């Protein structure tokens, strides 16, 4: 929430573009980074982006900018225990009591997300992010594309084995559109 509340979205975009680094948003904070941006990997946590989870699992450094790392964002999803075990975690939060509260961090920074992002940008070397830049961009694109294809394949309205709630809802309210029908309609 710190990125949104602090007006740091443009600074977050600038960091992502400077480093060509994928950006995941926290649980229920999809507004913290534009989903249309090429480096947007999507939200983490319950019903989040499988692409984001796969990408963050490969991270060697995670900058948790303006987030308390709530307990829901790093929960496993889609059978992926994605929170990186060996990555250096840098957590930036305006509330010092939240730093390291739910996840072990390598570096904790108590500060405003916007100011910290601007200071980080100013301190980056001219070659920061150059190593494997093109490969990283390709990996982000391929991972997001695979997730988009998987989502578009979810074109059935069948219930999971042993459940009937979809069938009952369709019968009861046939005039309403299911989420999967809505997804297909906007494709």
Regions found by a protein language model. Give the residues of each.
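Cofactor-binding loop segments of dinucleotide-utilizing enzymes, especially the Rossmann-like FAD-
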Residues: 1, 26-28, 67, 92-94, ...
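Short glycine-/acidic-enriched loop or helix-start segments at secondary-structure transitions
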Residues: 7-9, 34-35, 72-75, 101, ...
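Short, acidic Gly/Pro/Ser/Thr-rich loop/turn segments
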Residues: 4-6, 31, 70-71, 97-99, ...
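Short, solvent-exposed amphipathic alpha-helical segments in soluble enzyme
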Residues: 9-20, 77-82, 107-108, 125
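Anionic-ligand anchoring segments at beta-strand to alpha-helix junctions in alpha/beta enzyme folds, i.e.
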Residues: 1-59, 182-187
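Phosphate/diphosphate-binding loops
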Residues: 45-98
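Phosphate/pyrophosphate-binding active-site segments
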Residues: 86-187
């Amino acid at each position: 929430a710190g990125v949104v509340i602090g007006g740091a979205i443009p600074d977050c975009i600038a960091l992502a573009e400077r480093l060509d680094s994928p950006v995941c948003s926290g649980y229920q904070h999809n507004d913290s980074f534009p989903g249309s941006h090429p480096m947007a990997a999507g939200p983490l946590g319950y019903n989040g982006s499988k692409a984001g989870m796969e990408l963050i699992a490969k991270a060697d450094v995670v900058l948790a900018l303006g987030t308390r790392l709530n307990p829901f964002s790093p929960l496993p999803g889609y059978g992926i225990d994605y929170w990186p075990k060996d990555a250096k975690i840098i957590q930036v939060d305006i509330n010092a009591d939240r730093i390291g509260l739910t996840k072990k961090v390598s570096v904790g920074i108590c500060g405003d997300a916007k100011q910290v992002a601007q200071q980080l940008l100013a301190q980056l070397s001219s070659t920061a992010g150059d190593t494997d830049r093109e490969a990283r961009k390709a990996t982000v694109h391929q991972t997001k594309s695979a997730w988009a294809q998987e989502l578009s394949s979810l074109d059935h309205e069948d219930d999971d084995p042993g459940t009937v709630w979809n069938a009952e809802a369709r019968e009861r309210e046939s005039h309403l559109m299911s989420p999967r029908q809505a997804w297909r309609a906007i494709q």
